[in-house]
Structure formats: C-alpha cells, structure tokens
Regions:
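Hydrophobic anchor at the beta1->P-loop junction of P-loop NTPases
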Residues: 13
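Glycine-rich phosphate-binding loop used to anchor ATP phosphates in small-molecule kinases
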Residues: 54-104
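NTP-dependent small-molecule kinase module
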Residues: 1-6, 31, 139-160
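Walker A (P-loop) ATP-phosphate-binding motif of ABC ATPase nucleotide-binding domains
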Residues: 10
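A glycine- and Lys/Arg-enriched "phosphate-lid" helix/loop adjacent to the NTP-binding pocket
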Residues: 97-144
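Conserved substrate/cofactor phosphate-moiety recognition/catalytic segment
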Residues: 19-75, 117
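Conserved nucleotide-binding/hydrolysis micro-motifs of P-loop NTPases
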Residues: 41-43, 84, 109-114, 157-159
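P-loop (Walker A) phosphate-binding loop of NTP-binding proteins
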Residues: 16
C-alpha cells in the first residue's frame, strides 16, 4: 500500500558500519528536508564511547521519543541506527504506522572487504573496528527478507 508522500514519513536506514548509511541518510535529509537521528553523532558530540551500549540505548530511546513527536506533527524522520534486527525494525514500523506515517526501509550492504576498507579510510572509530569484530557483526545482523521488505510502503536495497 503506497501512502502519500506529503504526510508524515519514517525512513529507516539499515546496514552495517561502512555500508553507506550516513552518506545516504544525509543525502535524504537534505533532499527531503527531514530530521535525521544518528546516535553516533550524538555520542561523539557528548564525548561518549560509541561502543557504550547502555548509553547508546538511552540515546536511541530519546531520539525515538523525539522522532515520534515529529511524525505526529507530519514531518519526515530518518532513523540512522543501523537497525540490525528485524524486531527493532518491526517496532519502529508499527509505531510509525500507528501515528499515520508512511514507512520506508533502505537497506545498504557491501562485501566485508569493502566495509572494512571504508571503516579504515574514515578512521572515525576509537577504538578501531577490527576485521574479526566486523565478521561477528555480519553473523548477528538480520538481513531484511523479501517478506519483511514487503511490509514497508517503499524500500530499496543498495549494495556494492
């Protein structure tokens, strides 16, 4: 079911580190005049360890509280959390729909070697992300299935 592009819209940008989430989210933010939520940016601005899962969870909860308020006002919100699990994506989709928002999923993927190269080139992570850590993340990441993708109003799969 295609919903109006003029009403509230939630855009979920999904993928592993180095997949291009921030690049896409910033492009969409500018083009759509959307509000973008990135926990990494907030944690960096607060000089917090981006690997502190407890604080990340609190920041994401706060971002989602603001996001829902903005959706209720009819705005476009971009969630740039990675959303590694289907249950997290389902929760966001269902809550946004309850507010009358259309929901988009943009899944970005790339081979591990490409992800690792991008992560090393940007050099933002402290401590560094090592290849074995990235391989563990690849194992736990739940790739959106065709059945899940069909639940969204609009979707895209972008890869290298």
């Amino acid at each position: 079911m295609e919903r109006s592009r003029t009403g509230p819209r939630l855009i979920i940008v999904c993928g592993l580190p180095g997949s291009g989430k921030t690049t896409l989210a910033k492009e969409l933010e500018g083009r759509l005049r959307a509000i973008r939520f990135s926990p990494d940016e907030w944690m960096d601005a607060l000089s917090l360890d981006v690997y502190d899962e407890e604080r990340r969870g609190k920041i994401e909860a706060l971002q989602w509280k603001f996001g829902q308020e903005l959706l209720a006002l009819g705005l476009t919100v971009i969630i740039e959390w990675g959303t590694w699990g289907r249950s997290e994506r389902d929760t966001l989709r269902l809550a946004a729909r309850a507010l009358g928002a259309a929901v988009e999923l943009h899944y970005l993927s790339a081979p591990v070697d490409v992800l690792m190269d991008r992560i090393q080139r940007r050099g933002m992570e402290t401590p560094r992300i090592e290849r074995d850590q990235l391989l563990r993340w690849v194992e736990i990441f739940q790739v959106p299935t065709p059945q899940e993708i069909a639940l969204f109003d609009t979707s895209s799969t972008l890869g290298v």
